[in-house]
Amino acid sequence: MTEQDAAIVVKPGTVSLDDLARVLAGQPVVLDPSFWPRVEAAAAIVAKAAQADTPVYGINTGFGKLASKRIPPDQTALLQRNLIVSHCCGVGPATPEPIVRLMMALKIISLGRGASGVRREVIEQLQGMLARRVCPLVPQQGSVGASGDLAPLAHMTAVMIGEGQAIVDGKTVSGGEALAAAGLAPLTLGPKEGLALINGTQFSTAYAISGVLRGFHLARAALVTGALSVDAAMASTAPFRPEIQALRGHAGQIAAAATLTALLDGSDIRLSHLEGDERVQDPYCLRCQPQVAGAALDLITQTARALIVEANAVTDNPLVLVETGEIVSGGNFHAEPVAFAADTIALALSEIGAISERRIATLVDPALNFGLPPFLTPDPGVNSGFMIAEVTAAALYAENKQRAAACSIDSTPTSANQEDHVSMAAHAARRLADMADNLAAILGIELLVAAQGITLRAPHATSAPLVAVIAALREQVPALGADRYMAGDLAKAAALVEADALPAAAIGVLPSDPFPRLA
């Protein structure tokens, strides 16, 4: 199989979230050949401008506050190289390889639109690095999301020209060594090419896309753990009736309620308390699941739409208008749409965890759990059961609540006030990874607690889909009897939630991918 055969062939302007999810899973990308003529036409316009007397930002001028400084033609290559190494100012831990690879793929898509003015060789260098698994070492911190993700993209570009550092087979090597080992030669940047590579939102967008995909997955998993909690608490399914959802009309709410109903259909536990149950209404954490989970699903779908647009966008500056031959300065590098999207995803992640934590608290409380023992241990007192697991869920929710504060409103001026309003998209998107980790752990705890509650409801059993979920859990974690070391149980349950390892019996009734595609 050739590199071309293994790669996703991308057509900028029509790339889907499915395509990008495959990149996160490890597939490389190559540009559809039909886009090369436009790429080459834009590069020719830039080459002509580099030899002219008229100042054009970033081609024959300095950058940022130094835009008034003219650069002679014989120094344009040096200008681009110096731009890259001077902007390699990232700090902090290395960005995970899947995010770096997605960032590189997004840059290929953006450059492939033929409005950046780079030569074909630039895109081919990125394609070669992806195909041969040359992963630039990109520190996570240092971008404010305007003028693009300068520092992270500079670290990516440094490896393209044989400088900086890369990770190959888990080892950190110089950029030059990484290219040589992959059979690639260092690239010499032409006019505007360094600027086109580091000016853009691809770092922030890569993190945000990963966040929206994980958010949708965890929102679906929360419907499974939430359904388990309904039966563990012997709660009512009447609030999930379709007539109630239709009277409000939100698509996510309707889908969430239908999913909960399907997951609980046929439950003997539910049938056992249809008569003689004196409770009138359940707590909100059980009763209002469609409203909360549905709102989260709707938010995730809306942000996905914005991120699909951004993934297909040209976000550097200046831009080449091939039809007119002009090179025009603009502001597409400003990552406000990404920052808003990331802030929105953070809200959804936080609220899914908030209501899950309340369900956990309900199930361990003998005043609320309708006849179950305190902390769901068969012998309370000498055993503490799930007492501290609930505390852990509360701690994780508190962390996510703090992280959910909007980053996009926290602008600060940079570059001698030339770049006087910034998006903070990089920070907004980066925190989603930690928030998703916390949410997976919270849902894992709910999975353990709700499964324990259902086990204690014997001889009554839950529905067939939920029996299958509990069986999958029990392959990893036995029901809790006497107290035991719990950290391993929590880790296994979180991994089950995160890995999409829930049984087909449950997955078959979950909401399907709602994400729009660009035609």
Swiss-Prot record:
Q: Which PROSITE patterns match?
A: PAL_HISTIDASE (PS00488)
Instruction: Quote one Gene Ontology molecular function term.
Output: histidine ammonia-lyase activity
Task: Quickly give the catalysed reaction.
Answer: L-histidine = trans-urocanate + NH4(+)
Q: Where is this cross-link: 5-imidazolinone (Ala-Gly)?
A: A146-G148
2,3-didehydroalanine (Ser): modified positions: S147
InterPro entries reported for this sequence: Aromatic_Lyase, Fumarase/histidase_N, HutH, L-Aspartase-like, Phe/His_NH3-lyase_AS
Q: Which domain of life is it from?
A: Bacteria
> Which GO BP terms, alphabetically?
L-histidine catabolic process; L-histidine catabolic process to glutamate and formamide; L-histidine catabolic process to glutamate and formate
Query: Mind telling me what this protein is named?
Result: Histidine ammonia-lyase
What is the gene called?
hutH
